[in-house]
Design a protein with these regions (language model features):
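Glycine-rich, basic loop-to-helix element that forms the pyrophosphate-binding segment
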Residues: 1-6, 249-267
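Short beta-strand-to-loop acidic/aromatic patch adjacent to the donor-nucleotide binding site
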Residues: 8-22, 269-280
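Conserved donor NDP-sugar-binding/catalytic core segment of glycosyltransferases
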Residues: 20, 25-57, 285-318
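A conserved acidic beta->alpha catalytic loop
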Residues: 20-21, 222-232, 251
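Short, flexible, basic/aromatic active-site loop/helix in glycosyltransferases
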Residues: 52-76, 318-338
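Acidic donor-binding loop at a coil-to-helix junction in glycosyltransferase catalytic cores
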Residues: 97-107, 361-368
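Catalytic beta-strand/loop signature of glycosyltransferases that borders the donor
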Residues: 118-130, 302-305, 379-385, 390
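Short, acidic, metal-binding catalytic loop of nucleotide-sugar glycosyltransferases
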Residues: 205-215
Length: 434
């Protein structure tokens, strides 16, 4: 706040803490030109990375209404319109005193309510990176217990933003719809798979070894594998009738589409429980534990906790991912700030059939979880019930920048749609109550 009070210019240039940069040719003039001509509240740009003397382009992604995560990457340099900043501070208040980490995040969110935050898709400076961890390592920063105080502060700021924008939801949940019975079994484990000959047998046996007080089956949606996966599944299915080996008629399916094939099939149970084709359940009572949790409060969805392991099932950092930041009072609101909700994910099928999953292979679970949480309560299991393998064949281990950008932009899009839907729902509820 002291900095904002002392600024006497029309614009304020921010260099992010801990960053070493070198502005490009006429970079400042370009930033000033764009912010002046567009009337934006803030502009930021792509840049170049300098690693061991070599330069490479580092494009960022566009800012959307759903770009409310505190980890949104603005790069190392941004230019703010002080006119827009003062207008936002007058309307919504300055960042509150006592914030240790979230002051700029708070200002950014307030600024975004009435002003455009605009990306310039040009590399206007060179940055020397200070965080060279793979994307697969950075994605778990928000569940690091060492960052708990930081995360609480960020959640408080994000919650205030959702309240200001009309998208915050009180902890009032809809009752579950009646089951569309009869279901062939109580629960179905669902595994979408393509070309996982090294791991699919382990995953299948992990599911079939479950001990439960109810009937269950395993639906493996084999997305036209070209290695030995299909052969392995056919052999396993011939030995255990609980294994249902589905090969879709379509050849354009992502992971979400494969899930839909299973969920809308006649062999799906009342509850559908996730198991990825290279992962394992942590013990043989996981299904029992999941269904018990569903029955505690009649949840529409239950999400467990998992441990990250290597191919040989040895725990590797960051270890347990338990999402203890979740609360009944604010979990579905904070879900709009963070990048994932955990695993394994399990669904009450009558609700899931109302929603379905988008036919993509990233963010499909986040999409359906956000929509379910808009109406229904989600239950949590905080002890580890799942092993998530990280190995050279795993798609989440280390993403190229272009892929990471595409994924982040897609999740911001999902948040944009969800925020709009929640604002509309709140508006309609307010109209009904008046």
């Amino acid at each position: 706040n002291r900095i904002l009070d002392q600024v006497r210019t029309d614009y304020l240039m921010l260099i992010m803490p801990g960053q070493a940069i070198e502005p490009g040719q006429r970079a400042v003039e370009r930033l000033l030109s764009v912010i002046d001509e567009s009337g934006a509240g803030m502009v930021y740009s792509d840049f170049k990375d300098s690693v061991e003397g070599s330069l490479s382009d580092h494009p960022l992604i566009d800012y959307q209404p759903g770009s409310i995560r505190d980890t949104f990457d603005l790069g190392s340099m941004a230019l703010l319109s002080m006119r827009a900043v003062r207008r936002a501070v007058k309307e919504y208040g300055a960042p509150r005193e006592g914030l240790k980490w979230a002051a700029f995040y708070d200002l950014r969110l307030k600024l975004s309510l009435d002003s455009v935050i605009l990306r310039i898709p040009e590399p206007l400076y060179t940055r020397i990176p200070t965080d060279r961890r793979a994307s697969g390592e950075r994605q778990f920063d928000y569940v690091d217990p060492r960052q708990r105080d930081y995360q609480i502060e960020m959640e408080e700021v994000a919650t205030d933003h959702l309240k200001r924008s009309g998208a915050w939801l009180e902890p009032d949940f809809h009752p579950l719809p009646r089951a569309e019975g009869p279901f062939p079994v109580r629960a179905s484990v669902i595994i979408p798979v393509r070309n996982r000959e090294r791991t699919i047998k382990d995953a299948v046996l992990s599911a079939l070894s479950q001990e439960a007080s109810f009937d269950f089956n395993l639906i493996v949606v084999d997305n036209h594998s070209t290695d030995r996966t299909t052969e392995i599944l056919s052999a396993l299915a011939s030995e255990d009738r609980r294994l249902i080996h589905l090969i879709p008629g379509r050849k354009d399916l992502g992971i979400g589409g494969c899930w839909n094939e299973a969920v809308f099939s006649d062999c799906c149970g009342e509850f559908a429980v996730q198991l990825d084709s290279d992962d394992l359940y942590a013990h043989n009572r996981v299904l029992e534990r999941v269904i018990e949790t569903f029955e505690e409060r009649r949840y529409a969805m239950v999400i467990g906790s998992y441990t990250i392991v290597n191919f040989d099932l040895q725990e590797i950092p960051p270890g347990l991912i338990d999402h203890k930041e979740w609360t009944r009072e604010n979990g579905r609101n904070n879900a709009l700030r963070i990048n994932g909700l955990g695993a394994p994910r399990a669904f009450y099928v009558p609700v899931l059939r109302q929603t379905a999953l988008p036919n993509v292979s990233y963010g499909e679970d986040y999409s359906v979880a956000l929509r379910i949480s808009r109406y229904y309560e989600i239950g949590r299991i905080y002890e580890s019930v799942y092993y998530a393998r990280r190995w050279e064949g795993n798609s989440d281990a280390a993403l190229p920048l272009a892929t990471a950008n595409r994924y982040d932009a897609y999740k911001d899009h999902l948040r944009t749609v969800e925020i709009a839907a929640r604002k509309r729902m709140n508006h309609e509820l307010g109209t009904e109550n008046n």
